[in-house]
Amino acid sequence: LNVGNAKLQKTSSNTSITDGNGNYSIAGATYGVFSDKDCTKQLAPLTTDENGNTDIVEVKAGTVYIKELSAPAGYKVDKTVYSLKVEAGKTATLKVSDTPKVTDTLIELFKIDMETQKDNPQGSASLAGAEFTWKYYAGFYNKDNLPAEATRTWVTKTIAETDSDGTTHYITKLADAYKVSGDSFYMQDGKAVLPLGTLTVEETKAPNGYLLEGAYMQSGDKSEQIKGLYVTQITEDGDLAVLSGSNQFSVSDKVIRGGVKIQKRDLETGDTKPQGSATLKDTVFDIISLNDNSVLVEGKLYKKNEVVKTIRTDIEGIASTSSDLLPYGKFRIVESEAPDGYLTDGAKPIDFTITENGKIVDLTDEAHSIYNQIKRGDIEGVKIGAGTHKRLADVPFRITSKT
């Protein structure tokens, strides 16, 4: 008889993505064996098993045409029409591979300041260098049933990037330019991709000058604030793999804030007690920003060298701000008005930095206090005789203080 046999063997075109991932299977793919290249006259069906093999079908010797009719789980349908030459009395095997469905639409994270909602850091803080830990799981999970171990893990950081109009953004995503550590990326067609499964991401290190606590992600529509771990899935949608939810998020961090306390002292005595009837109360100090970036103080943005706050001393000569007034950065205290009985002479500016959240920088010791010169004057007395009104020489006077 002029007949032979045809069979098919299927593999994955990208085993680095599909091996060990239960979302992909080469079992269940269906093919048609046709006598014509237009695939209108089907001779027999073929279905792959878990190893990608099909049963043998008997066909007339010659050339047959084979086309995939339905792809197995996780794969794209191969639209190629293959020709297979079958010899009489022999078995011809067609070897084919399917492309796994992946997404190259990866999540982008934009770091912003929580208070200003802008991508400009405050003071001397930075929005670059925030670190995010990404975990991929080869299965579909939610936050409550994630496995203890991820299939792959990556750590990336935010990097400053300037767009065409000169605006700087602080961005991170799953790409080598942002990678700090972790596994190799999944690759297909020269691009970093994500297979079908579950992806989580969480900020694990705040950038310099910001707090990790309270950080949240938000998609472009500014709807839900996502705190802590964000979980999304990559699922099949027709011939594609799609990321559930948004692929762009802003990530807001709260800037570190602190305060300052300053002591007024007498320049001559070095003491915190005034001389005579002078007072250390109501000394006026200006707090000036020394930062290249703007700072937000009491709801208003201030530029470099602008006065951000004015404070006054109490009866003890101490002036203080709240513990959350000033953002992370460098500032200067300048005396703008001396207290009653004192000159501004000797009052030197003091620079200080805010680096710890909720801490008041204490400038009340002798080395950091601001000193003022007491006002001084001379007196002149004339002694005259009671009856003559003549001036008397060499008469001693005693000067006593009433304060």
What do these predicted regions represent?
Residues 1-403:
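Solvent-exposed loop/turn and edge beta-strand elements of beta-rich ligand-binding domains
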